[in-house]
């Protein structure tokens, strides 16, 4: 339908009347119309060619549309649960699936063909039969389809669902056996739970009536398998599971977890979820499936299968096999209880029951003797967030930090510590007596320690008598004296006789041995003016010459022989 026709029928003006001057680079090759966008041109060309690429994906509906919005509007009819057309389309899809030659239609009951009939689920309007249950023939490799549940988990053997007693038919080597409704694996939300095929290619026909009487089903019989009954079955299974007391599995009734999709199956055992051993003397057993309450209703990854081990001739056990996936306890001591770090998940908390399978890289396997310990349900949370360095390795290879020795409930793994680990040097205070204190960098030098070239000049009060005129001019406190103050003091001293000038040096030389510590700190004024390095002899001369002479040249003339030791 062109845009002009659309504008006429809807009563709204087309884009050509809104902005006629806008450029229209996309022109129709079959007519004279031009469009603003390429999508509009493509949609218009389909009106000429009659192409309808948008196909309705609902089973039984063969309508096609040229526009995606028309398909979206049409799909709302099928999603309406109260629509009678929905039920009629589902019935038509069921009839067409039986008569067609598709893999889903080749599931008629026979002794040589391996197939599963889900007539109860196919009669439900809300069930989507677009997930075909394809069972290969004898000798073909069996692999579960994408739509099947990738994770299956066992329930305690004392579980029994309160459902109506219906008859199911189990065909083994062409011989039918009547089974109660507990052995009927129900399909919930339109997704097949598993492939039900044995090793020798036998077929499990899960129907409300025998396989030959499928076409003779009445309308009330088909309504018994509606979505309401499936939801009641799921709720009854969940309530029974929550109210179930804790048991300890024994060797006679081992309830083990089914292996995950990547776990290898033991040799000569089943490879498909829900498969049955080829035994002619099988007896009824409980088998049901409930959806994962932790996921959405249409999820295909949360379906669980319930199976138990009854007597020696039960449906899932015989004299040589305990479970269809695990060898007997005499052959292997490894139990999948401990391999995935949890026991029966019926005893796990409500919020963590199915979270173990959603966080698969955080589980750490541990091999034990196959018996559950009496640990609390909080152990499930310990193993849930215990991350492995490599998800495919059997055990962790990364060393955990000593700081995080206890397991944590936080999602942060313990291989990346947030604090200083134990192998780093500990920081201690500076005044810690246990630490070895090294000298600072500023106190270290490559040159040997030297006396400063110009040490401060200090005067000893014992070196001079009280009658010395210059004793009051020099400060008696040990403080440094500048060169200018020394020159002023020496120039202002009065003239003294020569006999009196010898008193000072004699007194200094007599007391020099008792005061060696003070003589090394005295510096001659003449040496300071001349710039020569200090010496003990010159320091003694400075004390005598500075107070015995009056000339500013500070000569030491006759005092030189008296200063030798």
Curated annotation (Swiss-Prot):
Residues 1-25, 79-119, 261-303, 390-434, 466-565 are annotated as: Disordered. Keywords: DNA-binding, Metal-binding, Nucleus, Repeat, Repressor, Transcription, Transcription regulation, Zinc, Zinc-finger. A zinc finger (C2H2-type) spans 26-48, 54-78. GO terms for molecular function: DNA-binding transcription repressor activity, RNA polymerase II-specific; RNA polymerase II cis-regulatory region sequence-specific DNA binding; zinc ion binding. InterPro entries: creA/MIG_C2H2-ZnF, Znf_C2H2_sf, Znf_C2H2_type. It comes from the Eukaryota. GO terms for cellular component: cytoplasm; cytosol; nucleoplasm; nucleus. Residues 1-19, 108-119, 276-286, 294-303, 466-478 have a biased composition (Polar residues). It is found in: Nucleus. Residues 80-102, 391-413, 479-492, 517-526, 537-555 have a biased composition (Low complexity). One of its GO terms (biological process) is negative regulation of flocculation. Pfam families: zf-C2H2. Belongs to the creA/MIG C2H2-type zinc-finger protein family. Involved in carbon catabolite repression. Represses the transcription of various genes including the inv1 gene. This is DNA-binding protein scr1. The lineage of its organism: Eukaryota, Fungi, Dikarya, Ascomycota, Taphrinomycotina.
């Amino acid at each position: 339908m062109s845009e002009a026709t659309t504008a006429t029928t809807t009563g709204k003006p087309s884009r050509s009347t809104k902005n006629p001057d806008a450029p229209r680079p996309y022109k129709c090759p079959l007519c004279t119309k031009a469009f603003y966008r390429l999508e509009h041109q493509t949609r218009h060309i389909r009106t000429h060619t009659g192409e309808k690429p948008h196909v309705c994906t609902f089973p039984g509906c063969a309508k096609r549309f040229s526009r995606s919005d028309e398909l979206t509007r049409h799909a709302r009819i099928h999603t309406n649960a109260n629509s009678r057309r929905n039920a009629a389309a589902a019935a038509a899809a069921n009839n067409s699936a039986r008569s067609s030659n598709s893999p889903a239609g080749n599931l008629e009951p026979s002794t040589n063909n391996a197939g599963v009939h889900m007539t109860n689920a196919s009669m439900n309007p809300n069930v989507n039969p677009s997930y075909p249950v394809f069972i290969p023939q004898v000798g073909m490799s069996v692999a579960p389809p994408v739509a099947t549940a990738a994770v299956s988990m066992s329930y305690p053997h004392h579980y029994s669902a309160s459902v109506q007693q219906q008859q199911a038919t189990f065909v083994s080597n062409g011989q039918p056996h009547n089974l109660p409704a507990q052995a009927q694996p129900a399909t919930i939300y339109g997704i097949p739970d598993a492939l039900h095929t044995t090793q020798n290619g036998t077929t499990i026909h899960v129907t409300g009536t025998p396989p030959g009487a499928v076409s003779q089903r009445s309308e009330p019989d088909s309504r018994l398998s509606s979505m309401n009954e499936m939801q009641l079955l799921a709720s009854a299974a969940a309530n029974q599971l929550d109210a179930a007391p804790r048991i300890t599995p024994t060797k006679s009734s081992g309830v083990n977890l089914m292996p995950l999709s990547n776990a290898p199956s033991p040799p000569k055992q089943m490879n498909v979820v829900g498969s049955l051993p080829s035994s002619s003397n099988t007896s009824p057993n409980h088998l049901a499936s409930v959806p994962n309450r932790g996921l959405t209703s249409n999820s295909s990854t949360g379906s669980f299968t319930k199976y138990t081990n009854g007597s020696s001739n039960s449906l899932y056990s015989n004299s040589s096999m305990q479970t269809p996936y695990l060898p007997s306890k005499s052959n292997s001591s490894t139990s999948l209880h401990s391999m995935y770090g949890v026991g029966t998940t019926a005893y796990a908390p409500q919020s963590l029951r199915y979270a173990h399978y959603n966080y698969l890289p955080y589980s750490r396997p541990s091999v034990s003797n196959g018996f559950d310990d009496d640990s609390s349900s909080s152990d499930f949370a310990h193993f849930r967030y215990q991350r492995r360095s490599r998800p495919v390795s059997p055990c962790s290879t990364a060393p955990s930090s000593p700081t995080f020795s206890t397991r944590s409930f936080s999602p942060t793994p313990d291989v990346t510590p947030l604090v200083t680990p134990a192998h780093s040097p500990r920081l201690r205070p500076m005044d810690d007596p246990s630490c070895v204190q090294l000298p600072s960098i500023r106190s270290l030098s490559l040159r040997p320690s030297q006396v400063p070239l110009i040490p401060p000049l200090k005067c000893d009060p014992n070196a001079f008598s009280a009658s010395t005129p210059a004793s009051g001019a020099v400060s008696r406190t040990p403080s440094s004296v500048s060169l200018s103050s020394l020159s002023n003091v020496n120039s202002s001293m009065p003239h003294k006789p020569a006999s009196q000038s010898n008193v000072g040096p004699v007194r200094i030389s007599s007391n020099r041995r008792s005061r060696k510590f003070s003589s090394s700190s005295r510096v001659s004024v003449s040496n300071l003016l001349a710039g020569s390095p200090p010496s003990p002899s010159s320091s003694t001369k400075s004390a005598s010459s500075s107070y015995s002479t009056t000339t500013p040249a500070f000569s030491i003339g006759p005092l030189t022989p008296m200063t030798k030791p």
